[in-house]
């Protein structure tokens, strides 16, 4: 769709989105009526349960109210869980878990037993177990197990914890692979609908299935479009769930005109800042990227959020970078009060139109997937992966041509920065296994290289060669003309890690040549 240069009041004419109210179906303006509160989540990869517990208790005192534990399946047992969750007040903090997909039911049983042993009020327990059959196909090419069988067993096992969600729609994987906003949303809706369709056909009530689904979206740097994306997501998902006519499974005041459960139509949304646009060089610029992304998600009304530490591209985040990531969200809450105002974008000529445009394009994609047999069939055929990989290719081309700007990488790079020991970090399985790309593949996978990867490879290769070619700017003539050309040339060559020697200007060409020879330049650029 096309975005106009500006919008006016008449652009709102005919838009039904302006009639929506906060906390009311179809939840365009959010699922909450009183505030815009969201949970600050931090991830913990559990190598030692005792150390992970100590870290969790520490960060809970520093503003975190949602924890995400990545646990190793081979170490799972009651004692392990007891150590991991020791002294954590589960009624006061959201607990989220991911492990090997073949052990999620075991994890659910252990969690239920632990909470029952501690005699917690189950109505106060909030959290999730990350079961995502389809994400494993997307990222690792593995079609393992039976989604319906595992899904049914998992929902049954977690039944004593009514507010725990166990079916994950990890659209973050699409975002990190370079998917455009409408692609991410359209495929996420088809992903969620696949759970709804298959599990309701297996005999599970629609309301129960819907209340067990959690969406995990990525956040790109398209500030206003991301705000609109979250608004459109809730609108579309509410209508998808409503089409299943979910019946209330408990007493509820939030019923539709035909008695359907409208609570089931609420989309549970976790958002995480994207890694696609993060960079290895000039890495502190990542803080600017993730800050604007966090603002988009907060204004878009997400339920919880993870801000990716700025150094994740080249090392395991340390205490410093994790503290900065936490504080980025806390600043939005405590200093900017983003958690106090519900959907401040409502009525905006621009954002209301963006919401409708994104919703329409995502809905068209959703329908095309459904017409082709659904999300599962599309994954097996490879059409989802092919479309997203094509977007990845197009965005890499845009970055190469500087139509998509990565500050510090393809535009205004730091001339003197060296990578040193920095090396791109390769992804690992969430259950603590090996590298993702080493696994044998049953289906085509997503290409999840970052937008900056090709520029970084060029700079790293230059640095590894042991000699940085010197590029000498021989500037002469009109001041404005020569500066413009010198600046362009400096940026262009510095993107490859070349040593750039800029100059104020020479009176004659001979003087410039003499200076270039004295500098032992490998390249001379006449500006």
Give names to the regions the model predicted.
Residues 179-185, 220-232, 274-287, 315-325, ...:
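Short glycine/threonine-rich loop-to-helix capping motif typified by GTGT followed
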Residues 226, 230-236, 240, 271, ...:
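Extended, hydrophobic alpha-helical segments in both membrane/secreted and soluble proteins
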Residues 1, 130-134, 170-176, 211-220, ...:
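A glycine-rich phosphate-binding loop feature that marks nucleotide/adenosyl-phosphate handling sites
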Residues 65, 90, 121, 160-164, ...:
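Intrinsically disordered or highly flexible coil/loop and linker segments, enriched in small
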Residues 154, 159-198, 288-366:
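Mobile "lid/hinge" segments at catalytic clefts and subdomain interfaces of large enzymes
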Residues 63, 119, 237, 300, ...:
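Conserved, mostly hydrophobic/aromatic
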Residues 1-29, 303, 361-471, 477:
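Intrinsic disorder at enzyme termini
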Residues 1-222, 226, 247-258, 263, ...:
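Catalytic alpha/beta active-site cores
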């Amino acid at each position: 769709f096309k975005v106009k240069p500006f919008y006016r009041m008449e652009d709102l004419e005919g838009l039904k989105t302006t009639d929506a109210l906060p906390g009311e179906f179809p939840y365009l303006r959010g699922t909450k009526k009183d505030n815009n509160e969201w949970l600050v989540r931090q991830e913990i990869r559990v190598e030692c349960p005792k150390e992970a517990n100590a870290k969790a208790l520490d960060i809970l005192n520093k503003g975190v109210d949602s924890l995400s534990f990545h646990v190793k399946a081979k170490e799972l047992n009651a004692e392990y869980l007891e150590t991991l969750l020791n002294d954590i007040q589960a009624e006061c903090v959201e607990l989220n878990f991911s492990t090997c997909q073949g052990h999620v039911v075991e994890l659910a049983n252990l969690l239920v037993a632990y909470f029952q042993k501690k005699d917690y009020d189950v109505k106060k327990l909030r959290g999730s177990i990350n079961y995502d059959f389809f994400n494993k196909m997307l990222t690792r090419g593995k079609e393992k197990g039976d989604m319906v069988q595992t899904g049914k067993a998992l929902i049954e096992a977690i039944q004593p914890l009514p507010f725990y969600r166990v079916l994950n729609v990890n659209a973050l994987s699409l975002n990190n692979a370079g998917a455009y906003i409408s692609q991410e949303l359209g495929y996420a809706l088809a992903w969620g609908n696949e759970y709804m369709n298959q599990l309701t056909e297996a005999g599970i009530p629609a309301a129960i299935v819907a209340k067990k689904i959690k969406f995990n979206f990525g956040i790109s740097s398209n500030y206003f479009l991301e705000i609109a994306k979250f608004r459109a997501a809730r609108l579309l998902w509410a209508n998808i769930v409503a089409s299943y006519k979910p019946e209330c499974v408990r007493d509820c005041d939030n019923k539709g005109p035909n008695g359907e459960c409208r609570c089931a139509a609420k989309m549970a949304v976790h958002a995480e800042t994207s890694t696609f646009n993060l960079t290895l060089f000039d890495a502190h610029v990542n803080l600017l990227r993730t800050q604007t992304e966090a603002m988009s998600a907060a204004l878009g009304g997400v339920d919880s959020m993870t801000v990716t530490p700025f150094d994740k591209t080249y090392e395991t985040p340390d205490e410093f970078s994790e503290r900065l990531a936490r504080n980025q969200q806390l600043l939005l809450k405590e200093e900017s009060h983003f958690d106090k105002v519900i959907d401040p974008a409502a009525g905006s000529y621009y954002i209301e139109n963006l919401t409708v445009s994104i919703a329409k394009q995502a809905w068209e994609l959703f329908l095309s997937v459904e017409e082709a047999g659904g999300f599962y069939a599309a994954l097996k055929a490879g059409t989802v992966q092919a479309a997203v990989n094509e977007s990845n290719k197009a965005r890499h081309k845009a970055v190469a041509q500087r139509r998509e700007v990565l500050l510090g990488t393809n535009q205004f790079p730091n001339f003197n920065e060296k990578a040193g020991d920095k090396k791109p970090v390769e992804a690992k399985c969430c259950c603590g296994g090996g590298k993702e790309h080493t696994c044998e593949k049953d289906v085509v996978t997503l290409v999840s290289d970052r937008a900056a990867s090709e520029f970084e490879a060029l700079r790293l290769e230059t640095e590894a060669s042991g000699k940085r070619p010197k590029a000498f700017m021989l500037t002469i003539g009109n001041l404005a003309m020569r500066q413009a050309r010198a600046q362009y040339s400096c940026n262009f060559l510095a993107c490859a890690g070349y040593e750039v020697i800029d100059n104020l200007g020479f009176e004659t060409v001979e003087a410039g040549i003499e200076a270039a020879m004295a500098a032992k330049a490998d390249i001379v650029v006449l500006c």
